[in-house]
């Protein structure tokens, strides 16, 4: 079934910033997709095209990207006569039209919006749920419900507190199902709210961009202590473990790291990569930390490789790998990490996201599907994580509708699968063993 019409528009994301939404029409109806956007972005990500007109949305408008879709991409895809089930051909056509390595001509936000809409239309054309269509595109016969990694304390570039490290997450690996994992996560989240309120007052329970609490604490170990206390208090010590996203590139200064980067600059307090690695070792020893994302700067390769060789936990590459096959290949070669953070808007098309996932899995890595801090009500990544069988997803706290949209969709998928539903649980790093 070929494409009849494509129309893009500018909408607002969960942070009140403009983003791209695409409507794609076939004989089967209308298929709509919206593109997310990050706050802490890796320098190697595909280019998100912003207008730069300071008189409008402080320069963050996306009318240029929208115009590229409506004026160039739409006519080309419609006249190609390609069917919406031909995801790879349609994605490749857009990449050829763009002609740049980082999608800087049209913008990754333009290409991705169309790519996501094509994928949804392709599922309808095949009369399949989106997650089954994605599984077929990836050549997967399995379908796995992921362990959710709930971001319950926000710091770094996602919050106005002094905390340097960006996310402190809970993973209900001991839950019996995805629905059960949601309950455990929500109960710990509410318990944590009480713990924070008792210690720091009601103001401290304000939430950050991803729905996590943002108490004004400085010590990262204090955040871990709060999370551990909430898990214990809720009665889930045996069922819930902790993950972190440090986003260390955000506080990398002159070859060192500044754990108080939101205060005035003072090079005397900077620490080395080795010292930071030792701090993580303490965290792993003292708390049930099983996953650390972006522990070092995106170009501090030596620190990554050294640390990954010395710990047995999951080390996730986000800014390091930016869902880019070339960066993933280098990280595999240098043994820099052992898990890929998969963000569709870092690479900019469904086909390339699937390829990046397969590349990581073929090299024995785990894969965690991820939202961005600037999200929309679009639920594509919920279907993506099931279809790609990655076993783990992070899409914020169990709070804020743009986060719950994804989690709720996953509960619907689990219900739809019925007896066929399998939950990754303790095997979240390697769900293929299920």
UniProtKB/Swiss-Prot annotation:
Localization, UniProt: Cytoplasm; Cell membrane
Residues with the N6-succinyllysine modification: 60, 89, 228
Matching SUPFAM superfamilies: Enolase C-terminal domain-like (SSF51604), Enolase N-terminal domain-like (SSF54826)
Its biological purpose: Has neurotrophic and neuroprotective properties on a broad spectrum of central nervous system (CNS) neurons. Binds, in a calcium-dependent manner, to cultured neocortical neurons and promotes cell survival.
Annotated binding of Mg(2+) 1, by residue: 40
Residues at the catalytic site: 210 (proton donor), 343 (proton acceptor)
Gene designation: ENO2
Main location per the UniProt record: cytoplasm
Cofactor note text: Mg(2+) is required for catalysis and for stabilizing the dimer.
Gene source species: Homo sapiens
Gene Ontology molecular-function annotations: enzyme binding; identical protein binding; magnesium ion binding; phosphopyruvate hydratase activity; protein-containing complex binding
Name listed for the protein in its UniProt record: Gamma-enolase
Regulation: induction: Levels of ENO2 increase dramatically in cardiovascular accidents, cerebral trauma, brain tumors and Creutzfeldt-Jakob disease.
CDD domains hit by this protein: enolase (cd03313)
Stated family: Belongs to the enolase family.
Assembly information from the UniProt record: Mammalian enolase is composed of 3 isozyme subunits, alpha, beta and gamma, which can form homodimers or heterodimers which are cell-type and development-specific.
Modified residues (N6-acetyllysine): 5, 60, 64, 89, 193, 197, 199, 202, 228, 233, 256, 335, 343, 406
One GO BP: response to estradiol
Residues annotated for substrate binding in this entry: 158, 167, 293, 318, 370-373, 394
Catalysed reaction, written as an equation: (2R)-2-phosphoglycerate = phosphoenolpyruvate + H2O
Keyword annotations from UniProtKB, A to Z: Acetylation, Cell membrane, Cytoplasm, Glycolysis, Hydroxylation, Isopeptide bond, Lyase, Magnesium, Membrane, Metal-binding, Phosphoprotein, Ubl conjugation
A Pfam entry, by short name: Enolase_N
